[in-house]
Amino acid sequence: MITSPTNLNSLPIPPGDFGLPWLGETLNFLNDGDFGKKRQQQFGPIFKTRLFGKNVIFISGALANRFLFTKEQETFQATWPLSTRILLGPNALATQMGEIHRSRRKILYQAFLPRTLDSYLPKMDGIVQGYLEQWGKANEVIWYPQLRRMTFDVAATLFMGEKVSQNPQLFPWFETYIQGLFSLPIPLPNTLFGKSQRARALLLAELEKIIKARQQQPPSEEDALGILLAARDDNNQPLSLPELKDQILLLLFAGHETLTSALSSFCLLLGQHSDIRERVRQEQNKLQLSQELTAETLKKMPYLDQVLQEVLRLIPPVGGGFRELIQDCQFQGFHFPKGWLVSYQISQTHADPDLYPDPEKFDPERFTPDGSATHNPPFAHVPFGGGLRECLGKEFARLEMKLFATRLIQQFDWTLLPGQNLELVVTPSPRPKDNLRVKLHSLM
């Protein structure tokens, strides 16, 4: 809601603590998974702080999400911490604004059309099956780093081309690059940010070689790079080389980091709930799955859909996001000043007991047709964000999650090894502190 400047000035700014000069509470934010929860308990559901040198107001809940997501470009515009903006690059969809963002989103969406996703399925399935075969031979697995390799292999194959995924340098460079995305922007050789900048330069140089090689080959739209090379903007011009590099790097990040977190959470939660694991298996047994999985077969698993929705609710791969206020406004009796940032909290929304009774419980029954979650208001379940900036690849993520879950449940049972720390590290995406050590039991 927008009110007159006079009325706004009479409203209080939300309570909170700015912390240290410039730095504010950045270190606590990066290192404490309960940062938002603790401050909500202290100050209430809307509070202020300072992060990365910026004043920030935290909000959560379905109503707050609706307020933010429906006022994009009117009251809010997308923004990222400085380190993230620099490392994603000026030509990545995530950092583009206005008409350029609209135009590029339309182009990139071609890589995630239903027919395109269907065409990805055989290669995705082959990669997943290959990793499952490796893990079965190993018996005991430290799962999280293995999941990272698998999702990167899928992303590199489907976004850049099959041969590229065999380049042994890409994965370690990419791991270093990701570690600095949400860091303090200090460009020194031994800082996370400095190391990430160097890794980004190496990745961009390699991407340039790949793109130039593809430009010499016959056109092919079998992967995202081929689609982007064939695309034309609103002026009927091809995308520039700098933009192609930034967009592909963004796709690799988006199709790898958060997906790994989601798959890890699935493995963790179903490892802790054998009854739910068995019910998923029973649903599969009724379908008599063949060697080749199709998109139509995957659509016939409503209980698995519920399980995945609950995984994304309980441990969302992205804890929240940022918007910048481009004009003063008010929300729930507080003044939100122009130039400040607003952070919407996915984790806190998903833990709201008014939306999800007993929110700490893993309960897929919430998402049955008559379950409590199906009666929630819009923007109560937002694992992929919302509005104009909703995750473009959300259906790609759902497809990979569902395919992986299906093949895993079909071929293996698993137990979590004792003596490990399952507490979640939250930056940049949630993962168990000891990387999820498991013992696999083959069912084939």
Swiss-Prot record:
Keyword Phosphoprotein: no
MF terms in GO: heme binding; iron ion binding; monooxygenase activity; oxidoreductase activity, acting on paired donors, with incorporation or reduction of molecular oxygen
UniProt EC number: 1.14.-.-
Keywords assigned: Heme, Iron, Metal-binding, Monooxygenase, Oxidoreductase
Domain of life: Bacteria
Pfam families: p450
Entry cofactors: heme
Name of the protein this chain belongs to: Putative cytochrome P450 120
Origin organism lineage: Bacteria, Bacillati, Cyanobacteriota, Cyanophyceae, Synechococcales
Name of the gene: cyp120
